[in-house]
Amino acid sequence: MQELFITADDRTGALEIGGIVANTQFSVPVGPEAKSDICCVVDTCSRHLHPEEAKRIVFEKHLREARFHCHKIDSGLRGNWPYEIEALNELGHDVALIPSYPDAGRRCDGGVVYIQDVPVLESPFGQDPLTAPCSSRPDEVI
């Protein structure tokens, strides 16, 4: 059984989390159909899809046997992450939502996600024409 299976909603997120995990001294395949006995990251390409389609894809990918399942969301809360998290819940996986990447100036404080000390909705992420977040507070969305 695979130790760690990770999905990400876009290629940059997949490469980002793959690089972080690879820093733990083992190789991490990244791609749409990546496979490994230890850990791999699969890019679901789901950020710009209809929410139900994104949920279906994440659900199907996470049918794979693994000790731990993770889904990397956008730290600016863009995309279909609420639906993708719902897929993990429906599969019986415990979910911890951690919308932060402090090294890039993205953090969650008091339940509000900040980009360079600006609430995400007031940041450039909040102006994304395709996948802007609907709140700076993830708990208001899920």
Please tell me what each predicted stretch does.
Residues M1-F5, Q25-G31, E53-A54, H62-H69, ...:
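Cap/lid and interdomain-hinge subdomains that line or gate substrate/regulatory clefts
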Residues Q2-V21:
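N-terminal signal-anchor module of multipass membrane proteins
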Residues A8, V42, P99:
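Active-site flanking residues adjacent to catalytic metal/cofactor-binding acidic residues
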Residues R11-G13, C45-R47, P102:
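Short, glycine-/Ser/Thr-/acidic-enriched flexible segments
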Residues L15, L49, R78:
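Conserved protein kinase catalytic core
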Residues F26-D43:
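N-terminal glycine-rich anion-binding loops that anchor highly charged ligand groups
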Residues C39-I57:
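Short, structured active-site "lid" loops
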